Amino acid sequence: MHKIFSKNNLIFFVFVAFIFVVIVLQFFVSSENATKVNLSQTFEPISWLHLLGTDDYGRDLFTRIIIGARSTLFVTVLTLIAIVVIGVTLGLFAGYKKGWIERLVLRFIDVGLSIPEFIIMIALASFFQPSLWNLVISITVIKWMNYTRLTRSIVNSEMNKPYIKMAQLFHVPTRTILIRHLTPKIIPAIIVLMVVDFGKIILYISSLSFIGLGAQPPTPEWGAMLQQGRDFISSHPIMLIAPASVIAITILIFNLTGDALRDRLLKQRGEYDESH
């Protein structure tokens, strides 16, 4: 048990430290250096002045990665907020109201989840003009379904419990039951899913930008930087390795944090497997 607790604490520390470092570094770099073209300094090697060198337009790679974190993480957070609001709201009503609302939502989810997520995202993003904002729409349209299904499942498990029955017996308003009684039961599981999905959404955003459906030059964004670095993989591999490494590390941190949160949630419910 102590090992589990220590492992989770270490993961949380790494997670918080990562977010802190990203935020602090924003104050030490200029967004102008991330987009300003300087053809006299193209492909500068790694140095104290340019920690990761410069790209084919003379822009500092380290600065572009830090500013790119702002773009990628902001869009990811915005997407998650939209997903949670839509998914949890539909899940609450589908689980509580039952009837045709539940059947309609479930049939829609069954159809949506039967198709690979990324294929749908590519199809949707292709209909819009490439931009980070359109990625928010494309990802939200498909990802809310997981949150609706999870929320409905939790609501169904709570509906037969005495406190809900008593609330209904005393004609407590539906809004009060949903917000004050059911929502607190949903929040822990939703937070775990959000943290796990954070890494997935970063990967989706980077992948869509990589194939030209997301951020457009000169906007610094990790996926767009991957696309740019691909053309110089032989002569200047750092242009590809740097953004790829940042994406991989970020996704790993959020995945480990999600696993740790899930373990703690199961432990609190008495469902934790000691051999895990």
Swiss-Prot record:
GO biological process, one term: nickel cation transport
Membrane topology: Multi-pass membrane protein
PROSITE patterns with a match to the protein in the record: ABC_TM1
Residues annotated as transmembrane: 10-30, 73-93, 108-128, 186-206, 238-258
Keyword line: Cell membrane, Ion transport, Membrane, Nickel, Nickel transport, Transmembrane, Transmembrane helix, Transport
Matching SUPFAM superfamilies: MetI-like
One cellular-component annotation, GO: plasma membrane
InterPro entries per UniProt: ABC_transport_permease, BP-dependent_transpt_permease, MetI-like, MetI-like_sf
Coiled-coil region(s): none
Keyword Membrane part of the UniProt annotation: yes
Compartmental location: Cell membrane
Top-rank taxon: Bacteria
Domain ABC transmembrane type-1: 69-258
Family indicated by similarity: Belongs to the binding-protein-dependent transport system permease family. OppBC subfamily.
Function noted in UniProt: Part of the ABC transporter complex NikABCDE (Opp2) involved in nickel import. Probably responsible for the translocation of the substrate across the membrane.
Assembly: The complex is composed of two ATP-binding proteins (NikD and NikE), two transmembrane proteins (NikB and NikC) and a solute-binding protein (NikA).
PANTHER family cross-referenced by the UniProt entry: D,D-DIPEPTIDE TRANSPORT SYSTEM PERMEASE PROTEIN DDPC-RELATED, OLIGOPEPTIDE TRANSPORT SYSTEM PERMEASE PROTEIN APPC
Protein name as it appears in the record: Nickel import system permease protein NikC
Originating organism: Staphylococcus aureus (strain N315)
Originating gene: nikC
